Design a protein with these regions (language model features):
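Viral RNA-dependent RNA polymerase
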Residues: 1-368
Length: 368
Protein backbone atom coordinates (compact mmCIF):
# COMPACT_ATOMS: atom_id res chain seq x y z
CA UNK A 1 0.00 0.00 0.00
CA UNK A 2 2.89 2.34 0.78
CA UNK A 3 4.44 1.77 -2.65
CA UNK A 4 1.09 2.34 -4.36
CA UNK A 5 0.53 5.66 -2.57
CA UNK A 6 4.13 6.71 -3.19
CA UNK A 7 3.84 5.98 -6.91
CA UNK A 8 0.71 8.10 -7.29
CA UNK A 9 1.96 10.87 -5.03
CA UNK A 10 4.99 11.28 -7.28
CA UNK A 11 2.68 11.56 -10.31
CA UNK A 12 0.60 14.53 -9.12
CA UNK A 13 0.92 17.78 -11.05
CA UNK A 14 3.34 19.92 -9.10
CA UNK A 15 1.89 23.25 -10.22
CA UNK A 16 -1.70 22.40 -9.17
CA UNK A 17 -3.29 23.52 -5.92
CA UNK A 18 -2.86 21.08 -3.00
CA UNK A 19 -6.40 21.90 -1.90
CA UNK A 20 -7.58 22.46 1.64
CA UNK A 21 -5.97 22.54 4.18
CA UNK A 22 -2.50 22.54 2.57
CA UNK A 23 -3.39 25.55 0.41
CA UNK A 24 -3.40 27.66 3.58
CA UNK A 25 0.39 27.34 3.66
CA UNK A 26 1.44 26.30 0.15
CA UNK A 27 0.61 27.64 -3.31
CA UNK A 28 0.99 24.33 -5.16
CA UNK A 29 1.54 20.59 -4.74
CA UNK A 30 5.27 20.88 -5.35
CA UNK A 31 5.78 23.32 -2.48
CA UNK A 32 3.66 21.20 -0.14
CA UNK A 33 5.50 17.98 -0.97
CA UNK A 34 8.89 19.64 -0.75
CA UNK A 35 8.16 20.66 2.83
CA UNK A 36 5.92 17.87 4.17
CA UNK A 37 6.43 14.86 1.90
CA UNK A 38 6.59 12.16 4.58
CA UNK A 39 3.56 13.50 6.46
CA UNK A 40 1.52 13.74 3.25
CA UNK A 41 2.51 10.21 2.23
CA UNK A 42 1.54 8.81 5.63
CA UNK A 43 -1.81 10.63 5.44
CA UNK A 44 -2.45 9.07 2.02
CA UNK A 45 -1.65 5.58 3.33
CA UNK A 46 -3.88 6.01 6.39
CA UNK A 47 -6.83 7.30 4.35
CA UNK A 48 -6.54 4.60 1.70
CA UNK A 49 -6.50 1.98 4.47
CA UNK A 50 -9.69 3.52 5.91
CA UNK A 51 -11.49 3.22 2.58
CA UNK A 52 -10.34 -0.37 2.05
CA UNK A 53 -11.48 -1.46 5.51
CA UNK A 54 -14.65 0.63 5.81
CA UNK A 55 -17.77 -1.13 7.06
CA UNK A 56 -20.46 -1.03 4.37
CA UNK A 57 -23.20 -1.11 7.02
CA UNK A 58 -22.74 2.64 7.49
CA UNK A 59 -24.47 3.04 4.13
CA UNK A 60 -27.73 1.94 5.73
CA UNK A 61 -27.60 4.95 8.02
CA UNK A 62 -28.35 8.57 7.18
CA UNK A 63 -25.18 10.13 5.79
CA UNK A 64 -23.72 12.97 7.82
CA UNK A 65 -21.25 15.16 5.91
CA UNK A 66 -19.54 16.32 9.09
CA UNK A 67 -19.07 12.72 10.20
CA UNK A 68 -17.10 12.03 7.01
CA UNK A 69 -14.93 15.06 7.68
CA UNK A 70 -14.39 14.50 11.39
CA UNK A 71 -13.48 10.84 10.92
CA UNK A 72 -10.94 11.62 8.22
CA UNK A 73 -12.56 9.93 5.22
CA UNK A 74 -12.13 12.99 3.01
CA UNK A 75 -11.04 16.61 3.13
CA UNK A 76 -13.26 19.57 2.19
CA UNK A 77 -13.16 20.64 -1.45
CA UNK A 78 -12.29 24.24 -2.25
CA UNK A 79 -14.18 26.23 -4.85
CA UNK A 80 -13.28 29.08 -7.18
CA UNK A 81 -14.19 30.54 -10.57
CA UNK A 82 -12.15 28.97 -13.36
CA UNK A 83 -9.55 31.32 -14.79
CA UNK A 84 -10.60 31.27 -18.43
CA UNK A 85 -12.59 33.45 -20.87
CA UNK A 86 -16.32 33.24 -20.12
CA UNK A 87 -19.05 33.78 -22.74
CA UNK A 88 -20.96 37.02 -22.24
CA UNK A 89 -24.17 35.07 -21.52
CA UNK A 90 -22.52 33.51 -18.45
CA UNK A 91 -21.50 36.93 -17.18
CA UNK A 92 -25.04 38.24 -17.68
CA UNK A 93 -26.61 35.21 -15.97
CA UNK A 94 -23.98 35.13 -13.22
CA UNK A 95 -23.35 31.46 -14.00
CA UNK A 96 -19.59 31.32 -13.89
CA UNK A 97 -17.71 28.09 -14.44
CA UNK A 98 -16.61 26.94 -10.99
CA UNK A 99 -13.85 24.51 -10.13
CA UNK A 100 -13.88 22.44 -6.93
CA UNK A 101 -10.44 20.87 -6.50
CA UNK A 102 -9.96 18.07 -4.01
CA UNK A 103 -7.09 17.96 -1.53
CA UNK A 104 -3.69 16.51 -2.38
CA UNK A 105 -4.34 13.52 -0.12
CA UNK A 106 -7.68 12.82 -1.81
CA UNK A 107 -6.05 13.19 -5.23
CA UNK A 108 -3.66 10.39 -4.35
CA UNK A 109 -6.24 8.14 -2.68
CA UNK A 110 -8.64 8.44 -5.62
CA UNK A 111 -5.78 7.72 -8.02
CA UNK A 112 -4.99 4.56 -6.04
CA UNK A 113 -8.62 3.46 -6.21
CA UNK A 114 -9.45 4.35 -9.81
CA UNK A 115 -6.32 4.81 -11.94
CA UNK A 116 -6.39 1.24 -13.29
CA UNK A 117 -9.88 1.84 -14.65
CA UNK A 118 -8.76 5.12 -16.24
CA UNK A 119 -5.83 3.31 -17.86
CA UNK A 120 -8.10 0.51 -19.09
CA UNK A 121 -10.44 3.15 -20.56
CA UNK A 122 -7.65 4.70 -22.60
CA UNK A 123 -6.24 1.37 -23.72
CA UNK A 124 -9.67 0.26 -24.97
CA UNK A 125 -10.57 3.62 -26.53
CA UNK A 126 -14.00 3.54 -28.22
CA UNK A 127 -14.46 -0.19 -27.41
CA UNK A 128 -15.32 0.73 -23.81
CA UNK A 129 -17.87 3.31 -24.96
CA UNK A 130 -15.59 6.15 -23.92
CA UNK A 131 -13.49 8.72 -25.73
CA UNK A 132 -11.33 9.62 -22.72
CA UNK A 133 -7.77 9.79 -24.04
CA UNK A 134 -8.78 10.59 -27.61
CA UNK A 135 -5.88 12.14 -29.50
CA UNK A 136 -6.17 15.20 -31.70
CA UNK A 137 -3.08 14.24 -33.70
CA UNK A 138 -3.56 12.72 -37.20
CA UNK A 139 -3.68 9.10 -35.96
CA UNK A 140 -6.25 9.98 -33.28
CA UNK A 141 -8.34 11.97 -35.75
CA UNK A 142 -8.27 9.10 -38.24
CA UNK A 143 -9.33 6.57 -35.59
CA UNK A 144 -12.18 8.80 -34.41
CA UNK A 145 -13.53 9.46 -37.91
CA UNK A 146 -13.39 5.75 -38.77
CA UNK A 147 -15.27 4.98 -35.56
CA UNK A 148 -17.99 7.54 -36.32
CA UNK A 149 -18.41 6.16 -39.84
CA UNK A 150 -18.69 2.58 -38.56
CA UNK A 151 -21.32 3.60 -36.02
CA UNK A 152 -23.33 5.47 -38.67
CA UNK A 153 -23.43 2.30 -40.77
CA UNK A 154 -24.72 0.38 -37.76
CA UNK A 155 -27.14 2.85 -36.16
CA UNK A 156 -27.71 5.74 -38.56
CA UNK A 157 -26.76 9.45 -38.52
CA UNK A 158 -24.65 10.81 -35.68
CA UNK A 159 -25.69 13.64 -33.41
CA UNK A 160 -23.54 16.00 -31.38
CA UNK A 161 -24.28 17.75 -28.09
CA UNK A 162 -22.95 18.80 -24.73
CA UNK A 163 -24.72 19.13 -21.40
CA UNK A 164 -25.19 22.48 -19.68
CA UNK A 165 -24.02 22.52 -16.06
CA UNK A 166 -23.10 18.84 -16.20
CA UNK A 167 -20.83 18.92 -13.13
CA UNK A 168 -23.80 19.81 -10.92
CA UNK A 169 -26.11 16.98 -12.01
CA UNK A 170 -24.52 14.01 -10.29
CA UNK A 171 -26.88 12.69 -7.63
CA UNK A 172 -25.99 9.91 -5.17
CA UNK A 173 -28.10 7.55 -7.30
CA UNK A 174 -25.96 8.28 -10.37
CA UNK A 175 -22.76 7.73 -8.39
CA UNK A 176 -24.14 4.38 -7.21
CA UNK A 177 -25.12 3.37 -10.75
CA UNK A 178 -21.67 4.29 -12.03
CA UNK A 179 -20.03 2.05 -9.41
CA UNK A 180 -22.10 -0.91 -10.59
CA UNK A 181 -21.33 -0.02 -14.22
CA UNK A 182 -17.61 0.00 -13.44
CA UNK A 183 -17.84 -3.37 -11.70
CA UNK A 184 -19.48 -4.91 -14.77
CA UNK A 185 -17.29 -3.23 -17.39
CA UNK A 186 -13.85 -3.28 -15.78
CA UNK A 187 -12.85 -6.81 -14.87
CA UNK A 188 -9.28 -5.85 -14.07
CA UNK A 189 -7.04 -8.79 -13.24
CA UNK A 190 -5.99 -8.96 -9.61
CA UNK A 191 -8.48 -6.41 -8.23
CA UNK A 192 -9.59 -7.77 -4.88
CA UNK A 193 -13.13 -7.50 -3.56
CA UNK A 194 -12.14 -4.96 -0.92
CA UNK A 195 -11.17 -2.55 -3.72
CA UNK A 196 -14.59 -2.88 -5.29
CA UNK A 197 -16.13 -2.41 -1.85
CA UNK A 198 -14.10 0.79 -1.38
CA UNK A 199 -15.27 1.91 -4.82
CA UNK A 200 -18.92 1.28 -3.95
CA UNK A 201 -18.71 3.06 -0.61
CA UNK A 202 -16.76 5.99 -2.09
CA UNK A 203 -19.43 6.33 -4.78
CA UNK A 204 -22.15 6.47 -2.13
CA UNK A 205 -20.38 8.94 0.15
CA UNK A 206 -18.61 11.27 -2.30
CA UNK A 207 -21.73 13.36 -3.08
CA UNK A 208 -21.86 14.34 0.61
CA UNK A 209 -18.40 15.90 0.77
CA UNK A 210 -18.06 19.40 2.23
CA UNK A 211 -16.96 22.59 0.47
CA UNK A 212 -14.77 25.23 2.11
CA UNK A 213 -14.81 28.88 1.02
CA UNK A 214 -12.34 31.01 2.91
CA UNK A 215 -12.50 29.62 6.43
CA UNK A 216 -16.19 28.65 6.32
CA UNK A 217 -17.41 25.08 5.74
CA UNK A 218 -20.54 24.49 3.66
CA UNK A 219 -22.65 21.35 3.42
CA UNK A 220 -24.03 20.67 -0.05
CA UNK A 221 -27.80 21.03 0.09
CA UNK A 222 -28.25 20.49 -3.66
CA UNK A 223 -27.38 17.00 -4.81
CA UNK A 224 -24.81 16.60 -7.51
CA UNK A 225 -21.50 18.43 -7.65
CA UNK A 226 -18.53 16.77 -9.29
CA UNK A 227 -15.19 17.70 -7.76
CA UNK A 228 -12.26 18.41 -10.04
CA UNK A 229 -8.58 17.77 -9.61
CA UNK A 230 -9.12 14.04 -9.16
CA UNK A 231 -7.39 11.53 -11.39
CA UNK A 232 -10.85 10.02 -11.90
CA UNK A 233 -12.88 13.14 -12.73
CA UNK A 234 -12.78 12.81 -16.51
CA UNK A 235 -13.49 9.08 -16.57
CA UNK A 236 -16.31 9.30 -14.06
CA UNK A 237 -17.95 12.26 -15.84
CA UNK A 238 -17.77 10.22 -19.03
CA UNK A 239 -19.40 7.23 -17.34
CA UNK A 240 -22.18 9.48 -16.02
CA UNK A 241 -22.79 10.90 -19.51
CA UNK A 242 -23.00 7.41 -21.00
CA UNK A 243 -25.47 6.28 -18.35
CA UNK A 244 -27.63 9.36 -18.92
CA UNK A 245 -27.56 8.77 -22.68
CA UNK A 246 -28.81 5.20 -22.37
CA UNK A 247 -31.42 6.18 -19.78
CA UNK A 248 -32.84 8.75 -22.21
CA UNK A 249 -32.84 6.08 -24.94
CA UNK A 250 -34.74 3.70 -22.63
CA UNK A 251 -37.35 6.37 -21.90
CA UNK A 252 -37.75 6.95 -25.66
CA UNK A 253 -37.84 3.19 -26.35
CA UNK A 254 -34.96 3.40 -28.83
CA UNK A 255 -32.29 1.67 -26.74
CA UNK A 256 -32.21 -1.44 -28.96
CA UNK A 257 -30.72 0.61 -31.78
CA UNK A 258 -28.74 3.25 -29.91
CA UNK A 259 -25.23 4.04 -28.74
CA UNK A 260 -23.42 7.04 -27.32
CA UNK A 261 -19.74 8.01 -27.22
CA UNK A 262 -19.00 10.57 -24.48
CA UNK A 263 -15.96 12.42 -23.28
CA UNK A 264 -17.01 14.30 -20.16
CA UNK A 265 -20.13 16.32 -20.99
CA UNK A 266 -19.55 16.14 -24.76
CA UNK A 267 -21.14 13.29 -26.67
CA UNK A 268 -21.90 11.86 -30.07
CA UNK A 269 -24.95 9.62 -30.26
CA UNK A 270 -26.37 7.27 -32.88
CA UNK A 271 -29.86 5.86 -33.28
CA UNK A 272 -31.98 8.95 -32.61
CA UNK A 273 -34.68 8.66 -35.30
CA UNK A 274 -34.96 11.35 -37.96
CA UNK A 275 -37.13 14.28 -36.85
CA UNK A 276 -36.99 13.11 -33.20
CA UNK A 277 -34.29 15.45 -31.93
CA UNK A 278 -36.80 17.63 -30.11
CA UNK A 279 -38.30 14.56 -28.43
CA UNK A 280 -34.80 13.52 -27.37
CA UNK A 281 -34.14 17.00 -26.00
CA UNK A 282 -37.43 17.11 -24.06
CA UNK A 283 -36.89 13.60 -22.69
CA UNK A 284 -33.45 14.64 -21.47
CA UNK A 285 -34.94 17.77 -19.88
CA UNK A 286 -37.50 15.62 -18.04
CA UNK A 287 -34.64 14.06 -16.03
CA UNK A 288 -32.83 17.37 -15.52
CA UNK A 289 -30.44 17.20 -18.48
CA UNK A 290 -30.17 20.38 -20.58
CA UNK A 291 -28.65 19.51 -23.95
CA UNK A 292 -26.85 22.32 -25.74
CA UNK A 293 -26.13 22.42 -29.47
CA UNK A 294 -28.03 19.17 -30.10
CA UNK A 295 -28.03 18.53 -33.84
CA UNK A 296 -27.25 15.96 -36.49
CA UNK A 297 -23.79 16.01 -37.98
CA UNK A 298 -24.02 17.30 -41.53
CA UNK A 299 -21.97 18.05 -44.64
CA UNK A 300 -19.47 15.38 -43.63
CA UNK A 301 -18.46 17.30 -40.51
CA UNK A 302 -19.01 16.66 -36.81
CA UNK A 303 -18.21 18.52 -33.58
CA UNK A 304 -16.69 16.75 -30.59
CA UNK A 305 -14.72 18.05 -27.61
CA UNK A 306 -14.31 21.59 -29.00
CA UNK A 307 -12.98 20.25 -32.30
CA UNK A 308 -14.61 20.20 -35.73
CA UNK A 309 -13.83 17.02 -37.65
CA UNK A 310 -14.06 16.78 -41.44
CA UNK A 311 -14.69 13.24 -42.71
CA UNK A 312 -12.65 14.06 -45.81
CA UNK A 313 -9.65 15.28 -43.83
CA UNK A 314 -7.74 13.02 -41.46
CA UNK A 315 -4.60 15.09 -40.88
CA UNK A 316 -6.15 17.00 -37.99
CA UNK A 317 -9.25 18.69 -36.54
CA UNK A 318 -10.19 22.35 -36.25
CA UNK A 319 -9.91 23.63 -32.68
CA UNK A 320 -13.06 25.70 -32.11
CA UNK A 321 -12.07 26.88 -28.63
CA UNK A 322 -8.72 28.37 -29.63
CA UNK A 323 -9.23 31.55 -27.53
CA UNK A 324 -9.20 29.37 -24.39
CA UNK A 325 -6.07 27.57 -25.58
CA UNK A 326 -4.22 30.84 -26.20
CA UNK A 327 -5.42 32.32 -22.90
CA UNK A 328 -4.30 29.23 -20.98
CA UNK A 329 -0.88 29.49 -22.59
CA UNK A 330 -0.51 33.19 -21.83
CA UNK A 331 -1.50 32.78 -18.17
CA UNK A 332 1.02 30.03 -17.39
CA UNK A 333 3.37 31.05 -14.60
CA UNK A 334 6.29 29.46 -16.43
CA UNK A 335 5.90 29.32 -20.20
CA UNK A 336 8.01 26.66 -21.88
CA UNK A 337 8.70 26.24 -25.63
CA UNK A 338 6.66 23.02 -25.47
CA UNK A 339 3.56 24.98 -24.39
CA UNK A 340 3.82 27.27 -27.40
CA UNK A 341 4.40 24.41 -29.82
CA UNK A 342 1.41 22.56 -28.39
CA UNK A 343 -0.93 25.53 -28.94
CA UNK A 344 0.36 26.05 -32.47
CA UNK A 345 -0.12 22.35 -33.24
CA UNK A 346 -3.69 22.43 -31.89
CA UNK A 347 -4.55 25.40 -34.12
CA UNK A 348 -2.77 24.04 -37.19
CA UNK A 349 -6.00 23.13 -39.04
CA UNK A 350 -7.81 26.43 -38.36
CA UNK A 351 -8.35 28.63 -41.40
CA UNK A 352 -7.09 31.58 -39.32
CA UNK A 353 -3.85 29.73 -38.52
CA UNK A 354 -1.47 32.14 -40.31
CA UNK A 355 -2.80 35.10 -38.30
CA UNK A 356 -3.06 33.13 -35.05
CA UNK A 357 0.45 31.75 -35.49
CA UNK A 358 1.90 35.22 -35.99
CA UNK A 359 0.10 36.48 -32.88
CA UNK A 360 1.19 33.56 -30.68
CA UNK A 361 4.82 33.79 -31.73
CA UNK A 362 4.78 37.55 -31.25
CA UNK A 363 3.54 37.40 -27.66
CA UNK A 364 5.50 34.22 -26.85
CA UNK A 365 8.63 34.24 -29.04
CA UNK A 366 9.95 30.87 -27.94
CA UNK A 367 9.65 28.89 -31.16
CA UNK A 368 11.85 29.23 -34.22
Amino acid sequence: MRQLCLRHLLKVHGDKSPGYPLNLDYTNNHAAMESEFVGILNSCIARLHMWLTIDETILAEEIDSYWLLENGYMDPSTIFIKDEPHPERKLVDGKYRCITPVSLVDQVVEACLFSEMSTANKESLFASGSAVGIGFHPDGVRDYINYVKSMEKKYGPATEDDVSGFDSLHTPQVYEASAEYDRLIFRIKGVAENWWKAHRVWSKLKPYSIVVIGDVLYVRTDEGMMDSGSRDTSRRNTTFRRLYGFYIAVLMDIVQNFDVLPNGDDANSWGIPENHLETYRKTAASIGITLRDLRYANDGKINFCSHLYDFNRTDGAVLTSWPKAVYKMLTKKVLEPYDVRQVLEEMRCNTQYPVLSQFVQKVAPLVD
